[in-house]
Amino acid sequence: THIPTASAADMAWANAYLFCAPTRFGGMASQMRAFIDTLGGVWAQGGLANKAVSAMTSAQNAHGGQESTLLTFYYTAMHWGSIIVAPGFTDPALFKTGGNPYGYSHTQGAAFTDEVKASIGHQTKRLIEMADKLTA
């Protein structure tokens, strides 16, 4: 089966980006950083600027660096000139899944509950709504 993967060309046409990457030693996995490194040409042409961006992560254990992963990714988005759309504390669903204002984070072995789905859904909906406002 074919699993679609994002490309630099996809980043050029998309109005919003939702990055989901595992945490490794307090940062994004090297495979995601390698993809980000391919975006230099699109970035140099301004193709990543003024786009809505949000991020989610996972780690093997609680306190495994999830928040630092999200924050350091947002530094990259700031270099791009993207507009960060974190979930903040804008929905009660977030408090039922850890209350991370930077983006949803999942711990390995934790159940994929309705609360988790609601938290991810809220962050995704917020990103899409903000992207729509930016492109209106």
Predicted segments, located by residue:
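Glycine-rich phosphate/pyrophosphate-binding loop and the adjoining helix
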Residues: 2, 86-136
